[in-house]
Amino acid sequence: MRKKGEFNSGIKQTNEIILNGKNIINSVDVKKTIILDSKYDSNYLTIIEDSVKKAYKDKNIKCSTKIEDNSLIVNLSYTKKQKYILDDLDIVVSDDGVSVNIINDDNYNTYAGIDLSKDNNKDDLIKSYKIKKYVCK
């Protein structure tokens, strides 16, 4: 499933979420594609890449990145039995610089989240993600 991206503060971001497991989810892979508005220097992507790699390393989430065609591709694997926010990356780009933040709390249940310490039914999760405007395949 993926969330449709729109340019917001100079960045367009999409998230493709793959739920692994037949009926009960045992891990999740997320592919984030980050596209920078053409008015910004392409070096910003390198700055974002470095910040993203450090942020996910600090959270002990397996992360690989690559830059291609003016896009940053971030592949994440969530495998530990804990709670995660899957669309947790908040990036703001301006003429003054770049701000990269990882959202840690979802007090209002507005993000695509999962708790791998619980038995998650794939169909129930997909219904929940559709409500949050994700496109599910």
Where is each model-derived feature located?
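Subset-of-secretome marker
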Residues: M1-K137
